[in-house]
Regions:
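N-terminal, motif-rich segments that launch catalysis or mediate targeting to/interaction with membranes
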Residues: 17-135, 142-278, 282-310
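Residue-level micro-sites within transmembrane alpha helices that shape
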Residues: 5, 139-140
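Cleavable N-terminal signal peptides of Sec/SRP-targeted secreted and luminal proteins
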Residues: 2-20
């Protein structure tokens, strides 16, 4: 097994889930995307994620969060801080909002190019694929696409708390964590942190349900311009950002801080989270399918040139 893949296994074992969408969400996106992969795309995923420890595509989906402690420069590549002000105004401008150090949008574009870059070695291609599997999830979490209060991390809230929410000691959550973890866990009946195998099982169950509920939504309807990734990624980012105006912060920060979000807010948020998880998975699958098709075409072209040289 390649050195990088050994590191991947170690990272996966060593850290407990505290990540965007929660590990359950990221794993569910990966499992759901896998159901829509073409045969060449499945081959590409299996080739790049090959390991002898039984780790699967859902483990790859959590890798980009695991390495942030060792590669701190990758932290800003999981989000973008647009100059928005929900609920009054929502917008994303790549030129204005993505700094020269990079953001989630530039990283998704760069990793798209790196997967099939013939100058990249297998480790670099594997890392690129794992970043994409993870970042498609992050992009569809609305609070990864807002500049307000560090993506909602600075908005302290209650969620299914016993104490009145006007008591600051009751505010055990921030808004970002509610969308990352509390809502996905409640959707799936999870009441505590899960270890590796139960977490996989919960994620697979969620993916199976979303697959059954969305059988008529075709994967080939999604944007797959891997040669010009921003043409697809920017509309997705704008869509996620708009959710902050339309729902996430629709009633304002003060209302969020005074309301237990585990009640009516959760009831309205749950179908939005389901839909965002599904869209992330469907778009990820279509993206990998396009990458696999492009890779196969490049290999055929190279084969023709080799024949001409003989």
């Amino acid at each position: 097994m390649h050195c990088f893949l050994r590191l991947f296994v170690c990272f996966t074992l060593a850290f407990q889930p505290v990540t965007a969408w929660g590990d359950v969400g990221h794993r569910a996106i990966a499992y759901l995307a896998q159901k829509y992969l073409t045969d060449p795309a499945s081959h590409l995923v299996n080739e790049l994620l090959e390991n002898d420890k039984g780790y699967d595509i859902s483990d790859a989906a959590t890798w980009a969060d695991r390495i942030k402690w060792k590669r701190p420069l990758t932290r800003p590549l999981h989000y973008i801080n647009p100059d928005d002000n929900p609920p009054d105004s929502c917008s994303v401008s790549f030129a204005h909002d993505c700094p020269k150090e990079g953001c989630i949008i530039s990283q998704m574009a760069n990793m798209t190019h790196q997967v099939n870059d013939h100058k990249a070695n297998k480790t670099q291609q594997t890392e690129a694929l794992m970043f994409l599997i993870h970042l498609f999830g992050d992009l569809h979490q609305p609070l990864h696409v807002t500049g307000v209060a560090s993506g909602g991390n600075g908005i302290h809230v209650c969620f299914d708390d016993k104490d009145p929410c006007n008591d600051d000691t009751a505010k055990k959550w921030n808004l970002h964590a509610v969308w990352d973890t509390a809502i996905p866990h409640k959707i799936n009946g999870i009441k505590h942190s899960l270890k590796h195998n139960p977490e996989r099982q919960a994620s697979e169950k969620w993916a199976d349900r979303l697959h059954q509920e969305n059988k008529l939504r075709p994967v080939n309807s999604e944007c797959t311009d891997i040669k010009d990734p921003l043409r697809c990624i920017m509309p997705w980012a704008i869509e996620s950002n708009q959710l902050n105006c339309d729902f996430v912060m629709k009633n304002g920060v003060e209302w969020l801080e005074e309301t237990d979000l585990g009640g009516e807010y959760y009831q309205s948020a749950a179908p939005i989270v389901d839909d965002q998880i599904f869209k992330a998975a469907l778009r990820l699958a279509a993206w990998i399918n396009a990458l696999a098709e492009d890779r196969a075409a490049a290999n055929r072209f190279e084969g023709l040139h080799l024949q001409d040289d003989l």
